[in-house]
Amino acid sequence: MIEKIWSGESPLWRLLLPLSWLYGLVSGAIRLCYKLKLKRAWRAPVPVVVVGNLTAGGNGKTPVVVWLVEQLQQRGIRVGVVSRGYGGKAESYPLLLSADTTTAQAGDEPVLIYQRTGAPVAVSPVRSDAVKAILAQHPDVQIIVTDDGLQHYRLARDVEIVVIDGVRRFGNGWWLPAGSMRERAGRLKSVDAVIVNGGVPRSGEIPMHLLPGQAVNLRTGTRCDVAQLEHVVAIAGIGHPPRFFATLKMCGVQPEKCVPLADHQSLNHADVSALVSAGQTLVMTEKDAVKCRAFAEENWWYLPVDAQLSGDEPAKLLAQLTSLASGH
């Protein structure tokens, strides 16, 4: 229902307009206060790159963060990552991730990013505290990438990157809750790069698509072509589950059942195993896998995806960030 409201298919969005006006007024006032320096943002001693979005829901932001970190690492840049840690609750903040950190403590995305990249990752509701924690333990870090946080103006930033779902884009264009917007589309004029996940990019936007890899067994790490798996049950606890199910079908998989889960939903063995009958194979997102690895069965697999950016602009963006980081 919420997707239909946000897309404008359902007329119910009009009933929510008063709340959206209030949301827009408050969020606009907050940004204006920082712009006019009525409130002061904290500036890190190293460059900060924000990878965020204008809308609620999944846009492919985390794969972009992973791509960015890996690309900078390949260029010899030491990168740290900070996040709010949605879906997790640590005993105290800031929390610097380690090999023992769970998704219950740090949230899904930070654990995924840490496991994929090996970069220092810290979470805190106050992102400046997360930055300080990384720099205290890793003083050689040259640049910070923040996963989400475009609207977290308490942390000053040097580069802003926005990721857009190229198919859904901005729906009916209204602020939450009548629409999906955290900020209006005009905010794109002030950011440094716009990356469009799927769909047809517009002038000045960087095209991106998510390239699926081989399926990975959660228990053994064995890899195979996902199309070789039989009697598949697919689950996805991400911002936009239909995207994952569509990816599976694009890979030649016809799931016997698709189960969308809430983003950041906590998972346990009993609930997940109940979704699969004897003889079936469970396939999930990598984000779900970081929550299930500790109690996975032999027939549980995940499908990793990598961001693939096209055109000349990604190289220019990376050159800009490398230059920024090298100056510190």
Curated annotation (Swiss-Prot):
Per UniProt, which keywords does this protein have? ATP-binding, Kinase, Lipid A biosynthesis, Lipid biosynthesis, Lipid metabolism, Nucleotide-binding, Transferase
Reaction(s) this enzyme catalyzes, per UniProt: a lipid A disaccharide + ATP = a lipid IVA + ADP + H(+)
An example GO BP is: lipopolysaccharide core region biosynthetic process
Origin: domain of life: Bacteria
Mind listing the GO molecular function terms for this protein? ATP binding; tetraacyldisaccharide 4'-kinase activity
Annotated binding of ATP, by residue? T55, A56, G57, G58, N59, G60, K61, T62
Xref: InterPro entries: LpxK, P-loop_NTPase
Q: What is its EC number?
A: 2.7.1.130
Pathway assigned to this chain's UniProt record:
Glycolipid biosynthesis; lipid IV(A) biosynthesis; lipid IV(A) from (3R)-3-hydroxytetradecanoyl-[acyl-carrier-protein] and UDP-N-acetyl-alpha-D-glucosamine: step 6/6
The family classification in the record reads: Belongs to the LpxK family.
Write the protein's name. Tetraacyldisaccharide 4'-kinase
